[in-house]
């Protein structure tokens, strides 16, 4: 079996992948999407010996019938199921150790996260200081949006005509 340091690293990886993408997750249970991500990111699923379909089938095998998630023990069982398929020609124990080393200490990769483009054709579209017309009024000098105040003209339903300058002075005139 794997050494105690590998087991600690394996459990840490399980927790990191279990909470990935779900702010409410406790880290004790992993769903199928995160299991597939773990297998892909840690190169357990290589596309040849172990495919995405194999990963999904193993997940379905190890979880309880009505459950949608697996715990750490079921996670280790799933790795044991995939190990001989991933490392053909090795014994079950050697294959499990090898697959544990692939997973241990890894964390989810944020592949596909993009940054805002600056320059070229998109510069005038993303720089709020270059906006014209009514769109210019939607942002303050720093480029932060003003919210609803920038999108709508708020009506004054006080009863006065819009250009009237002495609104609210009638009571002062009558009392004198």
Swiss-Prot record:
Any one cellular-component term (Gene Ontology): perinuclear region of cytoplasm
Biological process (GO), any one: microtubule polymerization
Residues recorded with modification N-acetylalanine: 2
Cysteines engaged in disulfide bonds, as pairs: none
Keywords: Acetylation, Cytoplasm, Cytoskeleton, Microtubule
Database matches in InterPro entries: EF-hand-dom_pair, TPP/p25
Similarity comment: family membership: Belongs to the TPPP family.
PANTHER family cross-referenced by the UniProt entry: P25 ALPHA-RELATED, TUBULIN POLYMERIZATION-PROMOTING PROTEIN FAMILY MEMBER 3
Function statement: Regulator of microtubule dynamic that has microtubule bundling activity. Required for embryo implantation; possibly by regulating beta-catenin. Also required for decidualization via regulation of beta-catenin.
Protein name: Tubulin polymerization-promoting protein family member 3
């Amino acid at each position: 079996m794997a050494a105690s340091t590998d087991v600690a690293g394996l459990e840490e990886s399980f927790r990191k992948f279990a909470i990935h993408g779900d702010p409410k997750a406790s880290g004790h249970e992993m769903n199928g999407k995160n299991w597939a991500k773990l297998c892909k990111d840690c190169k357990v699923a290589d596309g040849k010996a172990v495919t995405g379909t194999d990963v999904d089938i193993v997940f379905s095998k190890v979880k309880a019938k009505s459950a949608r998630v697996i715990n750490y023990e079921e996670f280790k069982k799933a790795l044991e199921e995939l190990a001989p398929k991933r490392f053909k020609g090795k014994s079950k124990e050697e294959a499990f150790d090898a697959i544990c080393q692939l997973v241990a200490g890894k964390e989810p990769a944020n592949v596909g996260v993009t940054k805002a483009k600056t320059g070229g054709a998109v510069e005038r579209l993303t720089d709020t200081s270059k906006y014209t017309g009514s769109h210019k009024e939607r942002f303050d000098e720093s480029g932060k949006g003003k919210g609803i105040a920038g999108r709508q003209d708020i009506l004054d339903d006080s009863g006065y005509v819009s250009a009237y300058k002495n609104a609210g002075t009638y009571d002062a005139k009558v009392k004198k």
